[in-house]
A protein has these predicted regions:
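Blade/loop signatures of beta-propeller domains
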Residues: 32-45, 209-215, 277-288
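Acidic, Gly/Ser/Thr-rich repeat motifs that build Ca2+-stabilized beta-propeller blades
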Residues: 32-186, 234-250, 301-339, 345
Length: 367
């Protein structure tokens, strides 16, 4: 985890190892001085700075050698090593469009990365009808991506610069989940002929799994796994069930925590616990409707959630099974205690520090 001491809330920040590198010997990035100790409800954390100088970092992944791959929304793929941020960026990326909230967004390593060296990237890209989310993969060879190929293009594209979604998560079967926002055009999230406002599931090679819920339905895009999602920017697999849990941004209020299941409609914009910006007026039909899922948990006022992971390590047994996510709005680390499919407690940590949390990864041992 990283504290950003200067510049804007989202500039030059990066989440790093294990809830703030609580022990120096548990990680390979041990060249940085301890910055401060922070008390929480269940223990004291040590915060370290891992890297500075990043430009809107958005996604990250740990390489087998302990280095960290980091995406910068402005279009660069960087490496953080034992001496901090490496000067040169990785070359060979696909063509990326930086506009509004769009740019180079998330990344994930192939489950067989040790053998095939595939890195998957989500990003905004231009098309004949506008811009939209795409996913490509390339083989990492030293400081370059080789054999880059586009595996998925969100269709149709749009003209705005909002709500690209873009989290990437592999499940145990090697299928890739891609979260997509509604692109600022609310009705699109309820359409099966439109990728916007949905969660996508494809194979690692970009094919449609045979058991996807809308495969074979006339007019539906077979890649769609769920619909009615406003803008999912945090997703993680439950360590016991293997199901995909996610959170998404609401409008003014109504950020949600959900379990993403096949064929489920999560309601946006027909139902929501949020209201319209500025006017505070109701959106859609209220908060409930038959055939549309209720969130497991929601936030009013919004916290602007970002990044998400379940803690599964041994170093902090009191947190095992808890969800951690960042709050962009309040500049906090949020911890959720889970009982089955219920949130039973919430703790806000690292309050009022000059940093926003754009991504969160917890790791208690070196890769």
């Amino acid at each position: 985890m990283t504290k950003i001491p200067t510049l804007s809330q989202r500039l030059c920040s990066i989440w790093g190892y294990a809830i703030v590198l609580a022990t120096m010997q548990s990680v390979s990035l041990n060249a940085f001085a301890v910055d401060e100790m922070v008390r929480t409800e269940k223990g004291t954390l040590r915060i370290q700075i891992l890297a500075e100088g990043l430009d809107y970092p958005w996604g990250m992944a740990f390489l087998p050698d302990g280095r960290i791959l980091v995406t910068e929304r402005t279009g660069s793929l960087r490496i953080v090593g034992s001496d901090g941020l490496e000067k040169k960026a990785i070359r060979g990326l696909p063509e990326i469009t930086v506009r509004g909230q769009g740019g180079l967004l998330d990344l994930a390593l192939d489950p067989d990365f040790v053998n095939n060296r595939y890195v998957y990237l989500s990003y905004a890209a231009k098309g004949k009808d506008g811009i939209g989310t795409e996913v490509a993969r390339g083989r990492l060879d030293d400081m370059r991506l080789e054999d880059v190929e586009v595996l998925f293009r969100a269709t149709p594209k749009g003209s705005g610069g909002r709500h690209f979604g873009s989290r990437l998560v592999f499940d145990p079967a090697g299928r890739l989940y891609i979260t997509l926002g509604d692109r600022g055009d609310r009705p699109r999230a309820q359409r099966l002929d439109d990728h916007a406002g949905s969660v996508i599931r494809i194979t690692a090679d970009g094919e449609v799994p045979k058991d996807n819920p809308f495969t074979g339905r006339p007019g539906a895009r077979a890649e769609i796994f769920s619909i009615g999602n406003r803008n999912v920017q945090g997703a993680s697999l439950h360590p016991d069930t293997g199901e995909l849990w996610s959170h998404e941004h609401g409008p003014q209020g109504g950020d949600e925590l959900n379990i993403i299941r096949a064929g489920v409609n999560y309601g946006w914009p027909v139902i929501t616990y949020g209201v319209n910006y500025m006017t505070g007026t109701r959106i859609g039909e209220g908060t409930h409707k038959k055939g549309m899922a209720q969130p497991l948990h929601y936030w009013v006022p919004s916290i602007a959630p970002s990044g998400m992971t379940f803690y599964t390590g041994d170093q902090f047994p009191q947190w095992r099974g808890n969800i951690f996510l960042g709050s962009l709005k309040f500049r906090q680390l949020v911890r959720l205690e889970i009982d089955g499919e219920r949130v039973v407690h919430e703790e806000r940590m690292l309050e009022d520090r000059p940093v926003s949390y754009t991504h969160l990864t917890l790791q208690t041992t070196s890769p």
